[in-house]
């Protein structure tokens, strides 16, 4: 695994200020002023949305009554969109106040000059999904492939990649040096919560069925 992507909110600070809100926790998302103002993609087809649903489970208890009670309260404020990138692009464009999304998507917009949005890690805690590099069995040049994987997982390689892409990815080597002006905060500055990946993976179909049934009952 060479980098991870943390669950975040993308918050339009101008619209947030107009509403007189401070959005930094899951409870803040329940404000009635945010009805129809929070974007999420469809967890049935979007890994970004599934990760956000998984993080709610991590904060409130995996597949617990407390988690589902929270989700039921949140659903009236949600707008489900077909594209995970819309959850930060449409917020940056001023169409919505908040998007439930992933850090590197928002970070890329910020790096490119978007100054009306922020990456908000929920103060309740966040979790991340991992991205791996793998050696293909019986590949023609395994030694070269191994050397490449070793490099991109090394502090030297990840420091070079951080400098190249402007600090918009969270690399996994603890000795990676952040480039000057990196958009993302250090992992040590973030509150992390453990995600029960085994349970969520084994019960994904049932959890999504629960989500779909609940959404139909709450929103129609």
Question: What is each residue range found by the language model?
Answer:
Residues 1-95:
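Extracytoplasmic ligand-binding site segments that recognize negatively charged/polar headgroups
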Residues 1-4, 31-33, 92-93, 111-112, ...:
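Extracellular/periplasmic catalytic domains that process cell-envelope and extracellular macromolecules
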Residues 13, 42, 103-104, 164-165:
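Short secondary-structure boundary segments
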Residues 27-30, 57, 72, 88, ...:
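Non-transmembrane alpha-helical segments in soluble domains
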Residues 69-74, 80-81, 113-139:
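Periplasmic-binding protein-like
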Residues 92, 97-116:
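A ligand-binding cleft/hinge motif common to bilobed small-molecule-binding domains
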Residues 126-127, 131, 136-195:
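Mature extracytoplasmic/periplasmic domains
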Residues 189-220:
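Conserved C-terminal helix/tail region of periplasmic/extracytoplasmic solute-binding proteins
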């Amino acid at each position: 695994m060479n980098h991870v992507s943390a669950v975040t909110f993308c918050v339009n600070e101008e619209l947030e200020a107009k509403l007189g809100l401070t959005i930094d926790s899951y409870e803040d998302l329940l404000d009635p002023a945010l009805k129809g103002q929070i974007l999420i993609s469809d967890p049935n087809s979007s890994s970004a949305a599934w990760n956000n649903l998984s993080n709610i489970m991590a904060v409130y208890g995996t597949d617990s009554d407390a988690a589902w009670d929270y989700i039921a309260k949140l659903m009236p404020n949600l707008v489900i969109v077909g594209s995970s990138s819309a959850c930060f692009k449409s917020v940056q464009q001023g169409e919505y106040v908040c998007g439930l999304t992933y850090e590197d998507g928002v970070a890329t917009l910020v790096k490119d000059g978007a100054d009306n949005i922020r990456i908000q890690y929920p103060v309740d805690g966040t979790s991340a999904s991992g991205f791996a590099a793998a050696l293909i069995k019986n590949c023609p040049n395994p030694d070269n492939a191994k050397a490449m994987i070793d490099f991109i997982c090394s502090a030297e390689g990840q420091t070079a990649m951080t400098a190249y892409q402007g600090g918009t990815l969270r690399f996994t080597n603890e000795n990676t040096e952040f480039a000057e002006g990196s958009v993302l905060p250090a992992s040590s500055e973030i509150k992390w919560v453990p995600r029960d990946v085994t349970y969520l993976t084994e019960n994904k179909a049932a959890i999504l069925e629960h989500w779909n049934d609940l959404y139909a009952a709450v929103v129609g």
